[in-house]
């Protein structure tokens, strides 16, 4: 905010205990316009996510920006990104309808819970950047449908129990590929998850998911492993996943 003026906008997270009073100080000193966003509560002034809706509030009056079911992006962290980007665009004078259209059409950054397409009522997501269990946990947490999950790859000596426990009833089948498939299967069984299918390669895994999925399900590539056992990079793994999905 140091180089901003009252013509500018500073967008801050209302739930951050440091940023909230910082914003109040900026407003009191009339240094810059401040807009808060929140994913935990409705705001009287600001932009917030609640009950599947992103709303903009001014002086207690609210307007619906978008329902999150209409977004291709998934996950609370992405809804927060949408709120910040929308606040900045609206401040810059972009019409509400244009902002709404863009956020509904934006499919995300490549290989990061990237929406690929929907076939026969099944949505496909590419999270090839989920190269470790912590990153892959965010991938599964973002899913809002019963999910068939493709995991496995190069062994970076990770442990997988915490990732599998994060499935939290969402995962119908875990389809495993790569060097770690036996290690992950053992970890899964140790925490009570037994719906495991082994595949020889990514192409076969995609076909298995297609055959097992029901309309309303999601298929997610979020391997929790690096790609170097079968691929040059996570980017190549993600591109091949998309190619195999589109060829179904």
Regions found by a protein language model. Name each.
Residues 1-123:
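Acidic, Mg2+-coordinating active-site environments of NTP-dependent enzymes
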Residues 88-96, 101-111, 115-248:
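ATP-dependent carboxylate-amine ligase
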């Amino acid at each position: 905010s140091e180089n901003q003026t009252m013509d500018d906008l500073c967008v801050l997270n209302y739930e951050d205990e440091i940023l909230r009073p910082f914003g109040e100080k900026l407003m009191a000193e009339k240094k810059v316009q401040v807009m808060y966003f929140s994913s935990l509560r409705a705001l009287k002034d600001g932009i917030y996510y609640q009950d599947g809706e992103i709303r903009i509030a001014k002086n207690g009056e609210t307007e619906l920006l978008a329902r999150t079911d209409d977004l291709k992006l998934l996950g609370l962290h992405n809804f927060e990104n949408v709120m910040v980007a929308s606040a900045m665009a609206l401040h810059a004078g972009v019409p509400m309808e244009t902002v709404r259209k863009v956020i509904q059409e934006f499919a995300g950054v490549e290989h990061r819970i990237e929406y690929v397409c929907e076939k026969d009522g099944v949505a496909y997501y590419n999270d090839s950047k989920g190269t470790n269990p912590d990153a892959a946990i965010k991938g599964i947490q973002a899913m809002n449908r019963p999910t068939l999950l493709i995991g496995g790859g190069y062994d970076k000596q990770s442990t997988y129990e915490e990732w599998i426990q994060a499935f939290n009833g969402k995962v119908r089948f875990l389809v495993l590929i790569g060097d770690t498939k036996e290690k992950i299967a053992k970890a899964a069984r140790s925490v009570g998850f037994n719906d495991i299918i082994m595949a020889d390669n990514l192409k076969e895994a995609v076909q298995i998911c297609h055959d097992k999925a029901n309309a309303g399900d999601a298929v997610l590539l979020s391997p929790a492993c690096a790609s170097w056992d079968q691929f040059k990079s996570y980017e190549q793994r993600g591109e091949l996943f998309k190619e195999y999905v589109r060829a179904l």
